[in-house]
Design a protein with these regions (language model features):
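Asp-box/BNR beta-propeller blade signature and adjacent active/binding-site loops
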Residues: 1-322
């Protein structure tokens, strides 16, 4: 099914009223709704417009327990860079099921150049009502190519946000593209990331970092050598399908499902893969390729959604290369 005829980096959730809601970047941030579990979709509505030579990119969305919908996104200024336009994280809120949206809300700014920017926000609500946004952050590393995963907290449903703290960093490398979940045990936060620091891989590999809900990242960050940093795939059942852009979700019965992009068995182009993990988000296996494409076609910046009674929806940005 086509959700957006143009754009990329799409994510889907199921709302409390049963509808599906999708978001993507396409000359700003667009949303669409489906009332029939994805068979048909409403015409896209643009809720964030690009201004001041600053594209808004890579959105994520969440519905809070109180019904508020939040879309987070990433302003990425275009060249020529100016110090007044920084790479940042922003969000908008809707309290009427997506009909109207708040003004833009500031979360974080990195630096004003591409090499020291921030990227790819993704949100998680905790049982306490605390809302977290995780993102890839080069802002602290102005003298190197390193990158960490940072996280900001909101205690008022996304209206205001605290300062960032690092939750994972492998010295000399680039932890990126976080996708957080709370496991079914309601005791463990797991964040899927891309990690290009595994010895011998010379590429990104889908990885998890984790923390107890009790600790909740307070004065705690996962280092490159930490026992709380794990490769995702079980190589007894899966090939070494290196790649990045992971996305992680929890199934109703506790198992976990991961997507990522890889050139494995796909020539020089990238496609989408998924695998199923256990209730601890470990030992991912049953690897599959949701979109069967020619090796000349790309499926990138993908995600998975879990809807209805546990249906897994693969969401891919397809590009036919001419």
């Amino acid at each position: 099914k086509t959700v957006f005829s143009s754009g990329g980096y799409s994510r889907i959730i199921q709302l409390q009223d049963g509808r599906l809601m999708a978001v993507c970047e396409s000359g700003g941030i667009n949303i669409s709704f489906s009332s029939n579990l994805g068979n048909t979709w409403s015409s896209p509505v643009k809720i964030v417009t690009n201004t001041n030579n600053t594209p808004n990119c890579v959105p994520d969305l969440i519905q809070l327990k109180d019904g508020t919908i939040i879309v987070a996104y990433n302003p990425r200024p275009s060249e020529p860079y100016t110090e007044d336009r920084k790479f940042g994280i922003r969000c908008k809120r809707s309290t009427d099921n997506g009909q109207t949206w708040s003004d833009e809300i500031f979360i974080y700014d990195a630096q004003h150049t591409f090499n020291d920017g921030c990227w790819e926000p993704s949100m998680l609500e905790l049982p306490s009502g605390e809302l977290q946004v995780y993102f890839a952050d080069e802002g602290p590393y102005t003298n190197s190519n390193e990158q960490q995963i940072s996280m900001c907290r909101s205690f008022d449903g996304g209206k205001t946000w605290g300062n960032p703290s690092a939750i994972s960093f492998r010295a000399g490398y680039r932890d990126g593209m976080p996708s957080p979940v709370l496991l079914n045990d309601k005791q463990t936060i797991v964040v899927a990331i891309e990690d290009n620091g595994w010895p011998g891989y010379n590429d990104f590999f889908p990885t998890t970092v984790r923390c107890s809900l009790e600790k909740n990242w307070v004065h705690y960050s996962v280092t490159g050598e930490s026992e709380n940093r794990d490769k995702t795939l079980d190589f007894n059942f899966c090939p070494l399908a290196k790649g990045g852009a992971p996305y992680l979700r929890v199934l109703p019965w506790g198992e976990t499902v991961l997507s990522w992009q890889s050139t494995y068995n796909h020539g020089s182009t990238t496609t989408m893969f998924t695998a199923v993990g256990d209730e601890n988000a470990r030992n991912f296996k049953a690897m599959s390729n949701p979109f069967i494409t020619n090796v000349s076609d790309q499926v990138m910046w993908n995600s998975v959604a879990v809807i209805d009674t546990g249906i897994v929806v693969a969401v891919g940005g397809t590009e036919v290369l001419k």
